[in-house]
């Protein structure tokens, strides 16, 4: 039996953001970004080329009458084996991603960076509010890209995100341009990114469907899947004076940490959380169902952390094709 719905106040609102007028059109998107020529109409009515291995939806809500969908702004469940969208709530609606942004940051870093390269943390990267999500890095610290990626995904460090962006591209603005370029290449055309950490900006937004596109590309990388499924990581690095520093970073994912239990038949691999006042509580989760099908499930703008996991368990129980043990 699933737990009861929580009455929540505080971070996040349950109402959805403004939806985009048009749903995602694979043919038009492929033409716009020159994946096919403007004259090529042979594939106009098919999902070959751009979306042949993707879950595709017409944008109509699906399954929401059997869930407590009012606790979140948007959600979706995607079966990567059957290529089906099994649950859809406002999946093309404009949402603020908070730290789920770091999925794309990691994807770009893994594509363009070298895991063994060592970066020095700048004053800009270290200058993060202590009450925000940080790895407690100091100006002048030396860490490898691989280490910074653990801090980015597990600890959700905003400082690690800036250090990665500056290490890859020289500055945050140039890295954000690269993020937008890669997002569009993946078909995530209803998104725009301003920074690598997801701190709120009116012009920093995405959709559930775009996050699915980005995340499904990221999980093809073995290093990324290693990052999202790690519960605890001990990092050793040097500070600006050459002295050894050790920290222990913990995952922010309650399923991994054992403080939340998924429904029977579901095996949680990992994922990424995100929270800001404007974004609410967000979770992108990678799991398998009892048939072994890989599942991506996403919730954005939940009204509190308890309802985020309550709603996620509803989605896993009812729409990942599993039964509770």
Where are these regions (language model features)?
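Secretory pathway export signals and precursors
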Residues: 4-7, 51, 243
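Domain-terminus/edge residues, biased toward the C-terminal soluble/receptor-binding domains
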Residues: 11-15, 188-189, 202-205, 209-210, ...
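Active-site-adjacent loops and short helices of periplasmic peptidoglycan-processing enzymes
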Residues: 16-209, 218-219
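Generic detector of intrinsically disordered, low-complexity, polar/charged segments
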Residues: 7-9, 48, 73, 137, ...
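Sec-dependent N-terminal signal peptides of Gram-positive bacterial secreted proteins and lipoproteins
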Residues: 1-15
